Curated annotation (Swiss-Prot):
InterPro entries: Aldolase_I_AS, Aldolase_TIM, FBA_I
Pathway: Carbohydrate degradation; glycolysis; D-glyceraldehyde 3-phosphate and glycerone phosphate from D-glucose: step 4/4
One BP annotation, GO: fructose 1,6-bisphosphate metabolic process
SUBUNIT field: Homotetramer.
Primary role: Fructose-bisphosphate aldolase that plays a key role in glycolysis and gluconeogenesis.
Cellular compartments annotated: Cytoplasm, Cytosol
Protein name: Fructose-bisphosphate aldolase 2, cytoplasmic
Lineage of the organism: Eukaryota, Viridiplantae, Streptophyta, Embryophyta, Tracheophyta
Membership in a protein family: Belongs to the class I fructose-bisphosphate aldolase family.
Signal peptide start and end residues: none
Amino acid sequence: MSAYCGKYKDELIKNAAYIGTPGKGILAADESTGTIGKRFASINVENVEDNRRAFRELLFCTPGALQYISGVILFDETLYQKTKDGKPFVDVLKEAGALPGIKVDKGTIEVAGTDKETTTQGHDDLGKQCAKYYEAGARFAKWRAVLKIGPNQPSQLAIDLNAQGLACYAIICQENGLVPIVEPEILVDGPHDIDRCAYVSEVVLAACYKALNEHHVLLEGTLLKPNMVTPGSDAKKVAPEVIAEYTVRTLQRTVPPAVPAIVFLSGGQSEEEATLNLNAMNKLSAKKPWSLSFSFGRALQQSTLKAWAGKTENVEKARAAFLVRCKANSEATLGTYKGDAVLGEGAAESLHVKDYKY
């Protein structure tokens, strides 16, 4: 049996290619209620639905920002929310040329018999959920698998379980019209060097693409959301050019050219750091059969959140900060970012959270 060739085939290919358009990327605004609560706590804002809606409206309705955004990942609550004037967020995004996406996983659980390694849950009723989300206007989905680097981690068991879980999710999405974003995140936590991260990334990505092929996933109708290849959070930092070289080499060795785009997660890097690293990859003269873009959450929102601080009078200032980050990352997808963006408060600070849960 060959790759998926059902009724959504052409639509999946078209939407995946569109999301990967050079000059554009993904805004990850799919934080769970608990996670956004932690972000709000940092600016002393109460975690209630109206504040969550107000912050997301601030982002989605920033004039000029969505020209740099091809897709927005939403949380279940946000997919059905409206602006204060009563316009559904899904319509706001579509009219601005950004495809709505949806987070479909249900978080991680520990794998028995391992050293606190995890697998991701959410396969039960996933087909039904995807059909419902497609009906509501979503056109792509996200599922996050999490692996750790340690003395004996990741184990082969954790690698295989997560690869199979991602592949099973991916084919269910495609059968229901959603482009699956395949996200095997290798956490940055630890003292490991960049070579160890590169090795683990290669092993994990190879396992993922083996599983995707076994599940007959249409690669042209998927996107990959990996971590950049970097030293661990407790190791000495390296230059963006080094990260670019290691990351692109890792992808060359593992990601088939049928995949239209690779959209990096920021993994707790500062806003500016994530942009500079992405820019260095796109400046690198090397074989890159896929476009290299972004799917940033914290790295697009941090300075915006700080500027807003939950106050209506700060909305314009916050939108200006958001526009700066969107434009900078758009330039980074083209390798033309000069590092000259006006840095808002928080743009240079590390956003790393140990054992990060989305």
